[in-house]
């Protein structure tokens, strides 16, 4: 972000884990809310040292607290517990639209959809044709970028920022689920660039470390 002068950050859902409010029974002790809240405050404080505009969308994990309280806690209640900064903006929506300043380009829909596919870009492709715009999709923990099936819209799976080796439901028992991978997207001048772990991204080039 500092290299490219990016001052606005959108966290598109699942900032929290909230396993304590999951409908699934836990097989290992869940992280307590006090610990999540404290960690959240530290992360947001550090992000605000650089970013001037921090925007949160809701993901399925964040909504666990809403469901636990039968909707009595809204997005301001939840995220208000980690920051009161006027640089922080929260939404109860699981998506937002970023207009494309290039008159020849389509807008970008950033979404934490409720759908999952084992095949990367499948959900993003369907959403692009439903909403007629470029898609940056979350929730599935894939990292990929391409065109929709008709080659009109750019479709992206944004990856995730979580260590899957620390997720009990992923690691304890064998399963045929897709793997997860780290990643994020930079949107600048109407163009999206995806970043992932090496060799998806040459981080020596990004950080100007030539050694």
Range-by-range predicted roles:
Residues 80-91, 168-178:
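Short, solvent-exposed secondary-structure boundary motifs
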Residues 28-29, 102-112:
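Short, basic, glycine/proline-bearing loop/turn elements
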């Amino acid at each position: 972000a500092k290299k490219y002068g990016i001052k606005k950050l959108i966290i598109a859902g699942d900032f929290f884990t909230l396993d304590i409010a999951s409908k699934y029974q836990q097989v290992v002790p869940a992280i307590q809310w006090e610990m999540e809240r404290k960690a959240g405050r530290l992360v947001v404080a550090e992000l605000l040292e650089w970013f001037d505009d921090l925007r949160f969308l809701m993901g399925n994990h964040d909504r666990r607290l809403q469901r636990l309280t039968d909707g009595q806690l809204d997005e301001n209640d939840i995220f208000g517990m980690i920051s009161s900064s006027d640089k922080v903006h929260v939404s109860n929506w699981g998506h937002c639209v970023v207009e494309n300043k290039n008159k020849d380009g389509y807008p970008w829909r950033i979404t934490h959809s409720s759908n999952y596919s084992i095949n990367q870009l499948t959900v993003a492709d369907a959403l692009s044709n439903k909403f007629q715009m470029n898609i940056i999709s979350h929730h599935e923990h894939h990292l990929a970028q391409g065109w929709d099936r008709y080659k009109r819209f750019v479709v992206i799976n944004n990856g995730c920022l979580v260590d899957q080796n620390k997720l009990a439901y992923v690691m304890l028992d064998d399963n045929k689920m897709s793997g997860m991978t780290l990643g994020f997207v930079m949107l600048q001048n109407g163009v999206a660039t995806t970043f992932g772990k090496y060799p998806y991204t040459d981080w020596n080039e990004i950080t100007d470390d030539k050694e």
